[in-house]
């Protein structure tokens, strides 16, 4: 089986409490003299205490050119990405030249050559390293990325595969956009990165991380406009439909139950739920749909409060936090990692701790 050898998360360099970000959004998104009570309510309701940003807050008001924004994305993604991969390899006791596959995912910027290509020489990866850059999966890509590592390592069990997620959500900030979707997005999303190192069944490692048993993808018909981007002259304009939690409530239980049943398991057998921190309403919907105890998603809620929603990096930070001392589930028991994203879709990954 695929074994997760290390998970390493990093955050963008500038930390701000929620009130500072709310004030910045009010200055740049609301008309002069506008009533900001709706904005304040949305930002309080996100239950986010602090977030990290790629740039100092006073730089965002001047970012009105998509090219300049994307240049900032590339520079920030390379820096955070290098830190995340180097940290994960160090924790796994492996060197950059051990890496056979590097999967890179982000939905907050674009690059050609891709960020993984820009990192290869800097990190010291082999010239024959296989690379797979992904775009468009959004928040689901952390879970889907682990699933794709597992797919590769089933076919190449002597390989080492790395997933790198970098999301600089603050760089998608849309000035003068007072739409509910944009105001909600400015309340939730933060900047960070994470790297996962995984080893195939025939690759000997001293790592004691969980094994990946299986994964399953679900794409729901006629939901394309629930979540994603509209690409505009000023960059990425968020699409965020308030019906997202309802879709989760309607579909998630059946998807999870069917997946677990195929492996002789039920929800009661799962000792830890590693859920993407999409926001309070999404976490409530997951809890209600699966009839989980109120504290089942405490690690996800704590991550949301401390760093916000990191898009695809979020569930990887939560996996890392779940594996820390005092939180790690009993060895050999099942765990379920799950995330949702544009499509609308979910990705489920069955783990064994």
Regions found by a protein language model. Give the residues of each.
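Condensing-enzyme catalytic core mediating Claisen C-C bond formation in acyl metabolism
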Residues: 1-75, 160, 175-250, 254-258, ...
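Short coil/turn connectors at secondary-structure junctions
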Residues: 1-2, 96-100, 127-130, 155-161, ...
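Short acidic, glycine/serine/threonine-rich loops at helix termini
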Residues: 15-18, 113-117, 144-147, 172-177, ...
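Conserved beta-ketoacyl condensing-enzyme motif
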Residues: 42, 46-125, 131, 136, ...
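Phosphate/pyrophosphate-binding loops at sites that engage ATP/ADP/AMP, CoA/4′-phosphopantetheine
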Residues: 84-99, 205, 254-271, 322-329
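Claisen-condensing/thiolase-fold acyl-transfer catalytic domains that form or cleave C-C bonds
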Residues: 107-109, 118-121, 126-128, 133-154, ...
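Active-site-adjacent elements of ketosynthase-type condensing enzymes
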Residues: 111-118, 163-184, 214-233, 279-288, ...
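Active-site glycine-rich loop that binds ribose-phosphate moieties when present
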Residues: 134, 141-148, 168-191
